[in-house]
Amino acid sequence: MKDVYENPLCSRYASEKMQHLFSPQWKFSTFRRLWLALAESEQELGLPITDEQLEEMRAHLDDIDFDRAAEYEHRLRHDVMAHIRTFGDACPKAAGIIHLGATSCYVDDNTDLLQMRAALKLLRGELLAVIDALSEFAAREADTPTLAWTHFQAAQPTTVGKRATLWLQDFLLDLERLEAELARLPISGCKGATGTAASFLALFRGDAEKVLALEKKIAEKMGVPNCIPVAGQTYTRKLDSFVMNVLSGIAQSAAKMATDMRLLAHLRELDEPFEAEQVGSSAMAYKRNPMRCERVCSLSRYVVNLAANTADTAMTQWLERTLDDSANRRLTLPEAFLACDAILTLCANVVRGCKVYPRVMEKHLREELPFLATENILMRAVSLGEDRQELHEAIRQYSVRTAEDIKLRGEDGHLLDMLLADERFHLTPEVLAELLDVRQFIGLAPEQTRVFLDTHVYPVLKSRRGDIAGSVPVRV
């Protein structure tokens, strides 16, 4: 029986790995690891904490009694105190030194930052998987000619591979920003109730050097290079905003690619993967909708808007802190990562499974090449001694007449027939075929594709080969 709300990010979209990172188990076992790191560091700096107490804490990092914690929270109305009590019940000898000198934000904020670091690493692997898939696609289709579209009107031809490099470049920029944020994202450390570390200064009897050493030890034990230099009760929420802007950038790139694919699906030049028994419409049995790309666009819009939410939170924190960030962040941060995880999983799936239809592209090229080739035809005739202005006007008139035949009367275009019949253009069928060779119109597209892959993509993938995420199935 399902009679309560389920978050579709968990029930339909996000991977189990990302869901685990934002699970209660991960969060509160990290609380306990932070309490252990604090106690170990305090002992190392001379506080009276016994090895027996530390061993007891180490033995109970993951066996969390969530029912007991819920009972405590119902009574105390404080989730951190509830888990302090629950951990203390599991570690009665250590109960008196758990959370010694700390405030709630010691575990809350540090866990959030550790969570974001872990989630960014997971997204990094998934982003690399998309880049890897796109690099294979671009290399395979480097020479496949296709119409380019500007203003969604036919323009000079390009190749399918060259178009894919535009998507690739966006994702590479996202990878660069993600890695930069990950490299500099600190933890909050242990700075006490208002960021002054007064409680720890008292514990260490005024020894400021030990207070500074405490933070360094905790950061090392948690595997993070540094702590944020200063804070109020909380770390600056600008860090959340910076991270969310990375996620927003990934969503923007994904939506751009998915939108392009949706347009190409309409033109019948490309299809996303479509399962053997997949149904496109409950009414129209013939439908083959690009639903995965549509989902990418839908989730991307959500992530981009969540990024604005974190900016609002960062700028509305009062003085050393207010709690109006709490409920908002509990929703915004996990859901942004879960959605971004789903987006990248879908993108890799679509790119690896999409089908390209060169024959359809050739048809579209044949329809447009007569118009695209007129400049070359004009230049050749002028080189043979004809008047440019006179022939330019002739081409304009023939083009208008052809467009009317196509649009008003539904006929095939007759532009080439009219140009062949006009002796001023000095054309023969053989010459015309040569002038219409699509290879004359794609410029450096194949070479640009290969150079971009060799110079900008393959080195990135080679140096990070072990970090590329494996395939994750799309559930629905």
Walk through the language-model features, giving the residues of each.
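A helix-coil-helix interface module used to build multimeric assemblies
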Residues: 1-198, 206-219, 280-281, 291-295, ...
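Alpha-helical transition-metal enzyme core signature, strongest for iron centers
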Residues: 77-80, 127-134, 164-178, 247-257, ...
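Glycine-rich cofactor-pocket loops
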Residues: 139-161, 271-287, 320-327, 352-372
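Short, well-ordered beta-strand elements within core beta-sheets of diverse protein domains
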Residues: 162, 241-249, 376-384
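A short, charged helix-loop
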Residues: 216-233
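A conserved active-site cap/scaffold subdomain adjacent to cofactor or substrate pockets
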Residues: 234-269, 278-339
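Active/binding-pocket-proximal capping segment
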Residues: 271, 394-401
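Long, amphipathic alpha-helical stalk/connector segments used for oligomerization, subunit docking
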Residues: 302-388, 394
